[in-house]
Every structure is written in structure tokens, then in C-alpha cells.
Swiss-Prot record:
SUPFAM superfamilies: Phosphoglycerate mutase-like. GO terms for biological process: phospholipid metabolic process. It comes from Schizosaccharomyces pombe (strain 972 / ATCC 24843) (Fission yeast). GO terms for molecular function: acid phosphatase activity; phosphatase activity. This is Probable acid phosphatase SPBC4.06. The keyword Mitochondrion applies. Gene3D superfamilies: Phosphoglycerate mutase-like.
């Protein structure tokens, strides 16, 4: 969603198989991913050789439609062209002489369609073939929950990931359901449009980043870039374009293999610029609980509740989907990791992905069953006083809840590498801090829940 982007994600040469303790059984999986490579969201750096028109959207030539009277959905092909007005009134379009396959601003490029499909194929190799957690064929669309933001590139990326995970030959006829929300209800990214207070926080931390990094950018970076910016120096916030916009365009070009002035590929310049922009956008998550609450708290609680609901359904023998896929953005990935103190403070590349895996420790089941009689007796002795029924009921519920969660664990992998959440350091499963007790994860995200979201989002008068 933001104007910053980075290079493409790298998939491992060999897909890992079982890389967790054998006592643990994978039960539930949520995958949150950034969309694939896209065109810049705005025309910039033409003087550096970055073209206005990107002829990299040749695959955007079909859509699904159901024709009246037909039982099946059909693929309708079309030739798409981008037209431009001939004058400032924007009323009179040009004649039909534009090339085919030109991307509109922010559109998923052909490269982005490939990498998101590759992500789906990676997930298939790992969770279907290697771990045998997911079925080879998807015969019931209720077994998967899918959701994307209203941004077309996020929705299309989700479609490509799903198609890589379950190609047409591996799923039943018909169409799966993809859920979206109105922007006023969207929490699959930090929703600045719906939260004025979050906008204020971003502005405050952007100014802080400018004070920290503008002196650094005043040297070599400005010398390199000023020729492409009408002689002006590079600044985090006050230059035009601002630094995040420059870096977004550069990395969008790198991601989709668009050629441009080699000076802009200088590694030190790109690293300094990335450090400053990451601080601008996500430095606040290091120090502000409110930033975490408004930027990621609602989504984290959604993710946690799905895992908790699965545990309850598993205990009751009720049906519940085992897989959730979320088409999201760079800011989604970073906000989640930063709010959990697990972020490396590098901008998430295109098609970055988080796998949130829920495990059950099955080795303790037999022990708990053997002790169930003693536990029931103890419970009866503890809660036999009728005068305290109400309070005891709450204690029993809390006790049962803790017991229900005691054998369940969460692991988050970021671009195929497990991460350690801050609250789980020293608390992991048998010394493995990447495998976090579900109870600790739940308590951590509950503390970030924006209970009165709309009240908390009201701007503060300055």
C-alpha cells in the first residue's frame, strides 16, 4: 500500500521438510504475504531512464464472467490498452495508437504474477508434498479461508498464490470465495485512511527520522541524486519526490528488471536510503504501544482468534478450515513483525510471506488422559462452595482455557526463516524460542487490541 518497495523475495533452493520437533503436530496454517512486483505508483525519475510506460502487463488480458443461461464460468479474453488525454482538460483521449500490455500505476507486472504463483508452488511443495499437512486435491472450498485488501494487486496476488498451491487440475469445479472488506473496516494493513491518529503518529515519526538521517543524506546521496531532482538535495520528508517515493520507483524497476541509470543501483546509496525510510515508516513501532495498537493490533487479534477458534473446534470435534491465505502489503508484514519485536528493520521484498503455524504437542495427550480422573476430583473439591458459584465459574473457565492452550504452540516464519518473537525469548518449546506457547502469543496480542478503535483513532489537537 505504501510508496516504498524493495527487491524481490528469494525462495530457498530446497524446500524444507519437517523442521520442528517430532512431538509437535502441525494443525493450522495462516499465510500472510505481500503482493508481487508492480509498476511504480507514480511517474518518477524519467531523467534517470525509468520509462513512463512499462510494457510489462501482457498477462492482464482476461477475466472470469458468467454468461446468462450458462452454468459454468467462462474466461473472456480481451486486448487492453492504456489511453492518455491530449490536453489538460482530461476530456479528449488520444487515438488508438498505444501499445498493448502497458501497466497502469501500481499494477502487478508479469514478473509479479510469476513470483506470486511461485509462492503458491512453494507452499504446495512444503505443506502438501513434504509435510503432507494439506491434501493433494482440494475438494471442499470451505477448507480454506482467503482474504485480500481491496487493492487489485493484492487480490490478483492472492489468486496467483492460490493457483500455485492448488492448480485447476487439483481442485474441484466452481469458484473459491475470497473475502474483502470496505476500506472503513479494513485491518489487513495499517489503515491510515480510517485512522487520523495513526496518520499523526506516522507524521511524528517521519519528522524524527528526518532529523536523524537528513544529515547522512546530505552528503554522497544528494550528490548522486540531485542531477535527477532538478539540483535539489535528497531529504527523508521535505524533498520532492520524498525519499520513500524515490526508493519505491527504483526498487520497482529493479524488481521487474527495468533498465535505468546505473548510478542509482549503488549499494551504499540504496542501503542508506532504505535505513532512513524504514525508520520513517516503522521506527514508531519500536517505542509506541499506540502505534502497535492502531497499526497492527486489530489484525493480530484476528489471527490469534482464528487459532484459538481452531483449538476449540478441534477439542469439540467441530469442522474448521485448516488454511488461511491473506493477500496484503509490505506495511502489513513489517507492522506484524515490528509489533511482535521480531522485525529485522529491512524493507519487506515483493512477495514476502509470513507463515503462522499452529502446533499441538501430542506427546502430552496420553499423560493428560491418565490424570483426568484426578483432575476432575480436584476440581470438585476446589469449587464445591455454592456461595461462590459466580466467581468460581470464572476461575474454572480461566483454568480450562489455560489448560486447553497449554499444549499448543505458534511459530512464525518470515521468508522461510523462523523468527523469535520478543515475548517468547526464553519461553520457547524445549528451549526453541521460535516455537512460542499459544498462551503467550495470545496474551501479547490481547495487550495490543484497540478495544475502542474509533475513539483511539481520533486526532489529537496540537
Amino acid at each position: 500500500m505504501s510508496q516504498m518497495s524493495s527487491a524481490s523475495v528469494k525462495f530457498p533452493d530446497s524446500v524444507p521438510g519437517v523442521d520442528y520437533p517430532k512431538q509437535l503436530q502441525l494443525k493450522y496454517l495462516q499465510v500472510i504475504f505481500r503482493h508481487g512486483e508492480r509498476a511504480p505508483v507514480k511517474e518518477r525519475l524519467g531523467s534517470a531512464g525509468i520509462p513512463k510506460d512499462w510494457k510489462l502487463c501482457n498477462n492482464a488480458r482476461r477475466f472470469f464472467a458468467q454468461i446468462k443461461g450458462e452454468k459454468e464460468w467462462s474466461v473472456l479474453g480481451f486486448e487492453r490498452k492504456v489511453e492518455s488525454p491530449v490536453d489538460t482538460s482530461l476530456a479528449a483521449p488520444t487515438s488508438d495508437n498505444s501499445p498493448s500490455g502497458v501497466c497502469i500505476h501500481g499494477e502487478l507486472t508479469d514478473f509479479g504474477r510469476v513470483t506470486t504463483r511461485t509462492l503458491g508452488e512453494y507452499l504446495r511443495e512444503r505443506y502438501v508434498k513434504q509435510l503432507k499437512f494439506l491434501p493433494d486435491e482440494l475438494n471442499n472450498y470451505a477448507d480454506v479461508y482467503m482474504r485480500a485488501t481491496p487493492m487489485v494487486r493484492a487480490l490478483e496476488s492472492l489468486e496467483h498464490v492460490f493457483s500455485g498451491l492448488y492448480p485447476e487440475s487439483k481442485r474441484k469445479m466452481g469458484l473459491p470465495v475470497i473475502f474483502t472488506r470496505n476500506w472503513s473496516d479494513e485491518n489487513l494493513l495499517p489503515n491510515e485512511n480510517n485512522c487520523p491518529r495513526l496518520v499523526q503518529l506516522y507524521e511524528e515519526f517521519a519528522e524524527r527520522a528526518a532529523k536523524l538521517y537528513d544529515p547522512l543524506l546530505a552528503g554522497r546521496a544528494s550528490e548522486m541524486m540531485s542531477q535527477f531532482m532538478n539540483g535539489q538535495p535528497v531529504r527523508v520528508v521535505s524533498s520532492h519526490p520524498r525519499l520513500s517515493g524515490l526508493l519505491d520507483t527504483i526498487n520497482a524497476a529493479i524488481g521487474s528488471h527495468v533498465d535505468f541509470n546505473p548510478n542509482l543501483r549503488d549499494e551504499q546509496w540504496l542501503r542508506d536510503a532504505e535505513t532512513a525510510v524504514v525508520e520513517e515508516w516503522f521506527g514508531g513501532y519500536k517505542v509506541s504501544k499506540l502505534m502497535r495498537q492502531l497499526g497492527a493490533g486489530s489484525l493480530l487479534n484476528d489471527l490469534s482468534m482464528r487459532m484459538e477458534n481452531f483449538v476449540v473446534a478441534e477439542k469439540n470435534g467441530s469442522p474448521y478450515h485448516r488454511l488461511a491465505l491473506y493477500g496484503a502489503h509490505d506495511v502489513t508484514i513489517a507492522a506484524i513483525l515490528a509489533s511482535l519485536d521480531a522485525f529485522d528493520y529491512r524493507w519487506p521484498p515483493f512477495t514476502s510471506h509470513l507463515e503462522m503455524e499452529l502446533f499441538e504437542d501430542t506427546s502430552s495427550k496420553s499423560d493428560s488422559q491418565n490424570q483426568s480422573g484426578d483432575n476432575k476430583t480436584t476440581d470438585l473439591k476446589l469449587f464445591s462452595d455454592e456461595s461462590t458459584d459466580a466467581s468460581n465459574s470464572a476461575i474454572v473457565a480461566a483454568s480450562n482455557s489455560a489448560r486447553d492452550m497449554s499444549d499448543w504452540y505458534v511459530r512464525i516464519t518470515y521468508n522461510s526463516t523462523p523468527v523469535v518473537m520478543g515475548a517468547c525469548r526464553g519461553q520457547g518449546y524445549k528451549g526453541n524460542d521460535t516455537i512460542c506457547p499459544l498462551s503467550i502469543f495470545k496474551d501479547t496480542v490481547r495487550a495490543l487490541k484497540p478495544v475502542e478503535y474509533h475513539t483511539m483513532c481520533k486526532p489529537v489537537k496540537k
